[in-house]
Structures are given as C-alpha cells and as structure tokens.
Amino acid sequence: MNIIDRFEQENISKRTANKKIPDFEAGDTVKVTVKIVDRSIEKDGKEKLTERFQAYEGVVIAKRNRGITSSFLVRKISHGEGVERRFMTYSPIVHSIDVVKYGVVRRAKLYYLRNRSGKSARIKERHIPIAKTKAAKA
C-alpha cells in the first residue's frame, strides 16, 4: 500500500467515525440528508450563519467507487420533472444516508431511466428475508 492509499484510508476512517454509510447499489431508493448552511446579513451588518438539514429521496442510478472521491447519483421526479443530484459519499455535507427500499436491476448504471416515465420507469423491489431470532422461535 503506497502513501496516497494510506492517506485516503485514514481520511475515510476519520469521516465515517461518527456516521454509518449503508451498503447500497444502483436501483436502490435512498434518502440522503444534506446539511445546508445559509448566510444572512443582519441589520447591524453582522453575518449570521444558520444550519438546516434537507432530505433528498430518489433512486440511485449510478455509483462510483474511487476511495475518498466516491460518489453516487440520485434521481427523483419533482413536479413532473426529473432531477438528478450527485453526492460525494464521504463529504461532510452529507449528514446521513438511509436505504428506503432495495431494487432489483441488471445494470450498474441506470441512465436509461432518464428516457422513461410512469410505469416503465418502475424498479422491482428486492425482499430481504428477516433473520430468525430467538423471539421468532418462541
């Protein structure tokens, strides 16, 4: 392992120390919570910073695994228009990533969804079996 790889691994472990990044792939529906910082100038001339969180939910149509620069592309339909947004996986702006449902697809990149709408743009849901526990046996 060279020095650049070691530096990237250390940086990734620092950024993921306080948040969990789930395993997801193309076709999964995710909800990404993003931190937004607004700047406003008050009447006395002082600058005021306000933080808020905004949720963005959509289908992952592409995922790029490149170490610290890993990213994923999420597509959603907003007011009848398709909106795509790329998120850096290890960015401090990304507060949390939650998988809403898992999809079944046969491609790694789902760019063909851009040309589809309605029923033809649907993705089948992958059902994950629940592990048997002691409570289920009793």
Curated annotation (Swiss-Prot):
Cellular component, GO, one term: cytosolic large ribosomal subunit
InterPro entries: Ribosomal_bL19, Ribosomal_bL19_CS, Ribosomal_bL19_sf, Translation_prot_SH3-like_sf
Keyword Ribonucleoprotein attributed: yes
Domain of life, per lineage: Bacteria
Keywords: Ribonucleoprotein, Ribosomal protein
One BP term from GO: translation
Keyword set includes Ribosomal protein: yes
GO molecular function, one term: structural constituent of ribosome
Family annotation (HAMAP family): Ribosomal_bL19
Sequence similarity: Belongs to the bacterial ribosomal protein bL19 family.
Function field: This protein is located at the 30S-50S ribosomal subunit interface and may play a role in the structure and function of the aminoacyl-tRNA binding site.
Entry protein name: Large ribosomal subunit protein bL19
Organism this protein belongs to: Rickettsia rickettsii (strain Sheila Smith)
This protein's encoding gene: rplS
